[in-house]
Amino acid sequence: MQLLDRILGQPCRLCGRRGAVTLGPVSPTHPAAFETTDFRLRHCRHCDVVYLDPLPTAGDLELLYEDSVQFSDSHYTDPQQVEKILDYYGTSVRNLRLLPDSGGRILEIGAGLAWVSRACKAIRPDVTTVAQDVSSECATHCAWVDQYFVGALESLPARGPYDLISLTHVIEHLADPEAMLRSVASLLTQDGKAFITAPFRPTGWTPDQGVTPWRTYSYLHVPAHITYFSRDWFAQTLPALELDIVHWDATHENGQAFELVLRRI
């Protein structure tokens, strides 16, 4: 087994194929008493994903998301910043034709302050907005959300179907992103859309550069960000989930973040 690992690389946690190599060690970037403090980044030659290894423990995830305050600083509250965020999401839902028709339904997963719901309500007030998050931090601060559910997605009472589901800077936090996408597919209407944004990689990074550029990457959040995805991984994974890529753009923030739209087929 060790010989195979040296020759072919270790099995990738995301695609399962041999080809995952270690880029190098990374340390926690969040000040907390985590159970695990020794992490490394791995890159898969087959699906081109970079992921954190080992996975954070359940206790560390609870510490990150349920026992901490995430949305109180000026990045989320300054009026100019709020206007900038809403302009981006409003422009995106228009240009990418994501806005449901009158009476349509929107689900925001890992919603936080539910920016997509807010942008959609501003354009079309009669859409129904549902937000889900495991933290209650923002649940009473989102007047633009018709129903804010605090709890796991599988416990969501409003099971859909939805015309639009958004996961904005959410999927990179998940230990099992494929399972989440399967749930998304089950909650979408036929031809419904999913809007996903997430960190991509350091500007201009290539695997031969190793781990060094990652250590100064603004989106290296250890252990919060578990996976840095690629278009290849989505293209390999989605057909079995009855989802299709209709838009991919990895040029955001000078190539540091991507925007993805999926369609239920």
Task: Please identify what each model-predicted range represents.
Residues M1-T168, P177-L181, F195-T197, L220, ...:
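Conserved N-terminal segment of class I S-adenosyl-L-methionine
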Residues C138, D191, P202-G204:
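Feature marks short, surface-exposed loop/turn motifs that line or immediately flank catalytic pockets
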Residues A198-T227, D232-T237:
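Short, glycine-/aromatic-enriched active-site segment of Class I SAM-dependent methyltransferases
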